[in-house]
């Protein structure tokens, strides 16, 4: 009986630590994906003089090739659910362009086959890795429907 009690207490102490490690790993993976994808889109805009056209979540925008971006990561569910989405001149909270739009941004949005899990602790962890740790300011923030949004050009 005492052995069971000790094991259960150790398990109770280990679970939160394991969850923190999992959250940190997910946040690091997503932050890295945002960095890599933003570099691709910024390079494309520099080469062509314009941002790529708007595309749906999980769909690689026209003009972006498989040599430039890992399409399997873009088109499959992210570690927090949802799929990556290129937002060109789309409306999101706090948008600074006319009509409350952001000129260029990367988001993760829900799709029918990949629902987005709204984990604010995870998004705050991503914000700490990419920006200022505040989901209402800076280049990483909550977008429309509280989706994670990484702003490339206001």
For the regions a language model picked out, list residue spans one by one.
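Short, low-complexity, Pro/Ser/Thr/Gly-rich segments in the mature regions of secreted, periplasmic
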Residues: 141-154
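N-terminal single-pass transmembrane signal-anchor helix
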Residues: 1-23
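Extracellular/periplasmic head regions of type IV pilus-like filament subunits
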Residues: 42, 46-126, 151-153
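Short, exposed beta-strand-loop hairpins at the edges of beta-sheets
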Residues: 132, 136-143
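Membrane-proximal N-terminal amphipathic helix
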Residues: 23-50
């Amino acid at each position: 009986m005492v052995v069971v009690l000790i094991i259960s207490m150790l398990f109770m102490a280990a679970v939160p630590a394991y969850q923190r490690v999992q959250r940190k790993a997910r946040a690091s993976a997503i932050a890295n994906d945002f960095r890599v994808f933003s570099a691709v889109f910024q390079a494309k805009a520099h080469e062509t003089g314009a941002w790529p056209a708007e595309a749906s979540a999980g769909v690689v925008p026209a003009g972006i090739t498989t040599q430039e971006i890992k399409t399997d990561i873009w088109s499959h569910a992210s570690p927090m659910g949802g799929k990556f989405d290129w937002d060109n001149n789309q409306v999101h909270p706090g948008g600074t362009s006319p009509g409350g739009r952001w000129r260029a941004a990367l988001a993760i949005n829900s799709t029918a086959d990949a629902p987005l899990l709204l984990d604010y602790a995870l998004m705050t962890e991503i914000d700490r890795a990419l920006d200022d740790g505040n989901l209402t300011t800076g280049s990483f923030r909550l977008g429309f429907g509280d989706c994670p949004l990484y702003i490339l050009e206001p």
